[in-house]
Amino acid sequence: MARFAWRGVALALVVPLAACAGGDPQAGMESAAGVVLRDVPVETASSLPSVVAATRKLGTVMLAEAPADDNVVTSPSSVMVALGMLAEGARGTTLSELEAVLGAAGTRRKDAFAALRGTLLRMDGDPAVVKKDELPDVPVVHLADQVVVDDAYPVAADYLKALAEDFGAGTQKADLASADGKRVLDAWVNHHTGGLIDKSAIEPDPYLKVVLQDAILLAARWETPFLAGGTAPRRFTLTDGTQVSTETMGAAREITYAEVDGWRAARLPYVGGEIYADLILPPSGVDPASVTPELLGKVAAALDKAQPVLLKLLLPSLDIKPEAMKLQPVLAKAGLARLWCDTDPDLTGIGPGGLCVSQAFQRAVLKVDEEGTIAAAVTEIGVSGTSAPAEPELELRFDRPFLMQIASSQTSWPLFLAAIRDPRH
């Protein structure tokens, strides 16, 4: 594998953290002085389970709304954070609809997101780690958020303060109608994904006032690596029944395993045990993207309770880089059809000018090999104005389309959810 967080921000008024641009994506970054990032223990965040369930539900909507003839990689947690940032500036019915999708309202919503993100803080690291030849010895989960404001737009100071306090988001100003503004967005995306995603999906527009950006990057070794000698070309059956050959890893050892309603699943922890990957194989002929949030929840619960069994596991290596996902149909399906500029949302907490969502995208990548996993995603919302072991008796062969979910061990928050229909690379 070419090797390929939560940023605490102690930030009243807006003050510059860096003065000159150059090539630094943080240049020109601003944050609110005197603001301390919200710190909430998991035990006191009463709405955390409902936010996790809502994230799982949104992830299944993302899978279902993506093109049905290709691989899908999503980060439902990243979209939820971006929507949480948008909710800080929403009012009235718009806020109510956002909070229905987010799974919690008011202070409970803020506390849940702070607690969820806080569980990942200790795994933060330099996103450039993915450019090295080897995966890091301990997992890196890097989270970052920012708001880019058009340099002619009077954004509400209270809104920027809320984003800094609740999400650690810094602020940059740029001409969002120009290529210069695009370069600011691109540089931030490239930096916080270690170059895995090199450009923003947002397009310059004279009506664009604010862009919200959320990034997540993961680089983690398997707790027990696959043996390189066990990888070989093996058969994989595509959705249409075509059989192809793809590089497939093999393992025969004790692995946590469960079966739910005909779906078979294995859980592979990463080093340290704070995050894991659930590999989920649907019944033959069933599209993995047809999974329901209820079934995902049942599978997760079953794996939580399951004991390791001696299992022969065959899993394709992956190098998946889908096209950017347009989030408008996803969010409309999820219940947010009235955020857009052909409706009349209330985003007056962000600032004046009859604001509405004009662009929303997610880009994500997923790489899996014998050593571990690298994944990254960026969600952007543009707001416009106007000794030979015993032979296992049980075998789980991922030789047809399947799901892969990466989640926090402590909270089960789904960080990445992918439907693999063709693992060739």
Residue ranges and their predicted role:
Residues 2-175:
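Detector for small/aliphatic-rich hydrophobic stretches
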Residues 111, 116-278, 308-387:
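Non-catalytic, conformational "gating/processing" segments within enzyme and secreted inhibitor domains
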Residues 275, 282-307:
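Internal alpha/beta scaffold segment
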